[in-house]
Amino acid sequence: MSLKTPVLLVAATALLTACGTATTATTARTDATVTIPSDRFLPVISQSVTGGTVTFRNADADAHTVTSLPGAAVAFDLVIPAGGTRTLKLDAAGAYRYYCRFHAHYDPKTDQVAANPGADHPDEPMAGVIVAARNG
């Protein structure tokens, strides 16, 4: 298990907390883009607002998914072919954790995402977080 996942969760929580201030809410982007090169989500942490969208652009040679963790308040599972694009609309504020189920797996015992055996980046599971702040 990598230390990066807990660090990402702490960073996402801090970012979500900061989104509650009036200044941040008025300057938050409504839409975000996540690029998928070489079995990674970049940026790992994205910011949007309720009613906004996150567009995932697969710049990799193989297909990927953007899959919510089991038990998430909002479930999603987008399959994105190589070179494809998919968009996710965010209707509720919160931190949306996701991963690629083709290249990583979720362990409910540890609440962590880990890279699958043979992954391009075994120390960095293919996972990310979207932080959606209340709009307005």
Question: Could you tell me what each predicted segment is?
Answer:
Residues 27-50:
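N-terminal edge beta-strand
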Residues 67-78, 118:
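Short, compositionally biased
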Residues 80-136:
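Extracellular/periplasmic metallocenter environments
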Residues 1-8:
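Bacterial N-terminal signal peptides that target proteins for export
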Residues 15-18:
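C-terminal motif of bacterial Sec signal peptides marking the signal peptidase cleavage site
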Residues 43-62, 67, 84-92, 96-98:
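Beta-strand cores of secreted/periplasmic/IMS beta-sandwich domains, seen most often
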Residues 20-22:
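Bacterial signal peptide processing site
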Residues 38-40, 58-60, 70-72, 92, ...:
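A mature extracytoplasmic/lumenal domain signature
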